[in-house]
Amino acid sequence: MSPEGEESHAEDNLYFHNTQMQSIHEETLAEESHAQAIQRSISRLSSFKHEDTDSESPIPVQKVIRQIKKTNTNTNTTKTKKRKLKVSKPRKNMSSSESVRQMYGSRKNGEQQGSIDGFLMSRFGEVDGCNESDRSSKLISQGEWESLSKFHEESNEKDKLLRKKIQRYYSEPQEELGEGCGMLTQASADPETKMTKEELESLYDLDSSTVFNQTTISAIGDMSEPTQVSEPCVVILSQTKVQSEASTQEDGADASVQEIKSTVPAQELFSTPEFVPAPLEQPVNKEMCSDQSIVVLEENVQSTQADDSDIVELISDSDPEPEEVSTKVQVLRSIYDSSGPVNDKQPSVASETVESDSTPIVSPVKTPQGTRMHVVQVASSNPSSPIKIVEENTEQQEEVFTDVESIYSTARTSFGTPKHTSPVILLESSDTDCDDNDNDVEPLSSMPMVKTVPKKRMRTTVLQVSAALKVQNYTDEKNNIKLRKIGDDIPVEVPTKDVEYEEIPDSQESVGGEGDNSVSIIEITREVHNNDYTGDESTDLFQVGLNKQDTCEDTSSPVVQIGGVENDILDSSLIEPVPEPESVPVPEEVQEQPQPTAIDKHTATQLREKFQLWGLKPVRGKEKMVEILQGISNFILPEHELLAVADKQELQSCIFRKLDAVIREGRAMYDRILSFEPIRLEELQSMLQSQDHYLELDVLRLYCDSSGITTTNA
């Protein structure tokens, strides 16, 4: 090689090395700049770091364990040791508490537990006063335990006080009972303990002059002489310890009674100008014969005025003047007369006379005594007790049948109301001239008399007639027939098939459909007797029975003349307008009633069972069910064969096959179905009706769903 070639080669090498050095230098500078950027980012983020010198533990340096392979001639032993090293041991559950790990844990998982402690510290923070004795912040300190126990004790102080009060209330020691805090409790707790005089006075509100020996109550007088007639003792029972205004009034009333009895004998104490009680009889009692007492029981009632709503009149034979006595008895007085003759017989009902009065004022005037009392019942405005109301017999009610809803639907139109009566009072007085058999009292019933309502069964029929047929409201009270016009001059469209209401034409124009299409709706109600009513009986105008004298007339317009016939059954020939030049008699075809078919012979219950068996949509009314079944019968099978079908699938298959054939004949509907164009069920129904096939929408919907035909409601 020439020297020039060597120089050129050396220059090339120098250039290559320079470029390499320059690229390495640029890479070094880029790495340094990147490291500086990372350090700046770390320094900026270090301000957000949560540092805790107390609880933070230094992360130990991971130790690298190197295995030293030992040469061994025995290959089986070496393979066994290698297999043992690959077996992993199950890890134990480690605690998040550092103190627990130091005592019971190992040092192998120190790095993981340290990161867990750091996360818990940064997440939950630190509780003040809980770092004593180098414990974790998650442990509860002694101060916290003391505060919790103190709070629990303070919250239970109120409960303890309440518990003590309840125990004291139920226990009631004897020393507290002796202080007079509960006299009734004391008496029931210790029956042998006798109550003092002051306790008796405060309990019964007794006068101190009528109490002696702390346990016995008697009247003032010499008790040593049994033959001496002592004055009656007045006792007032009160349930309240504190004397109220009502008890003060009672004391005044008792004083008035004591003042009157000092001047008037005991027999005249309750005498009134109208009535004097009969001589009282008492059984033989030697100890009680000498004593005459009056017991007055009064309640704390503020008002003793008589109530005008409850008044009973007592009329005597001797004096017909009534005496008004309030039924709200507030004072009861019982008189025992020891001066009368002693009778060994059993006392009768009238041996003790009880008189009701609303005031303690007693008149001392005597009146003649009647021999026997009679019962008089006085009407009152106050309604009787609900217990005494007799339930009305539901059979004796008026029932109304409406063909629009169902022939079986009923509605009660009249209800009997019981009469309000006042209660009956039984009184009996002793009669010396009568025998013992006459004293027997026959019980009289206090039940109110209920007026029975005659049983009626009414039937209502709604008809649609031509507007040219003028009808007025008509009522026949004798035969219980009512005719009422509901609507007049209602325009309707000409139906293509059977109408729900019966139409009565009045001329050939209306029959042919060339006249006016407006109609009138009338309602006829008549009484149905038990002998001519059945559940399957159809209701129409021709079942209304009329009287010959009853007519409906209107001089201003053509009117139907109802009545003037010999029989009670209204025939279609009777429904004709007033003779006019323009009117035409009704054709003979209207007079003939159609013969009942096989479906018409079935009852509504049987037809409803057929609907349920074949899976058809249930409808209300027998006429509607017959119409649906006749449309299906005209479409697939005769009526007798249709009724013989006993399977739902068989009926549906027959209907679906017939529908397939009919739709294929009409190319327009068939092409729309083949092109998956959504069709409306109403359009399919109208197409079938144009061919005199009448099926319900639910049957068509079932056919479309089973055949995969797309339908729409738009």
Curated annotation (Swiss-Prot):
InterPro entries hit by this protein: Slx4_ascomycetes (IPR027784), Structure-sp_endonuc_su_Slx4 (IPR018574)
GO cellular component: Slx1-Slx4 complex
Organism: Candida tropicalis (strain ATCC MYA-3404 / T1)
Higher taxonomy: Eukaryota, Fungi, Dikarya, Ascomycota, Saccharomycotina
Region (Disordered): 1-114, 338-369
Pfam families, per the entry: Slx4
UniProt subcellular location: Nucleus
A GO MF label: 5'-flap endonuclease activity
Superkingdom assignment: Eukaryota
UniProt function note: Regulatory subunit of the SLX1-SLX4 structure-specific endonuclease that resolves DNA secondary structures generated during DNA repair and recombination. Has endonuclease activity towards branched DNA substrates, introducing single-strand cuts in duplex DNA close to junctions with ss-DNA.
Keywords: DNA damage, DNA recombination, DNA repair, Nucleus, Phosphoprotein
Basic and acidic residues bias (residue ranges): 1-14, 24-34
Protein's recorded name: Structure-specific endonuclease subunit SLX4 2
Subunit description: Forms a heterodimer with SLX1.
Keyword Oxidoreductase: no
Compositional bias segments (type: Basic residues): 79-92
Composition skew (Polar residues), residue ranges: 36-46
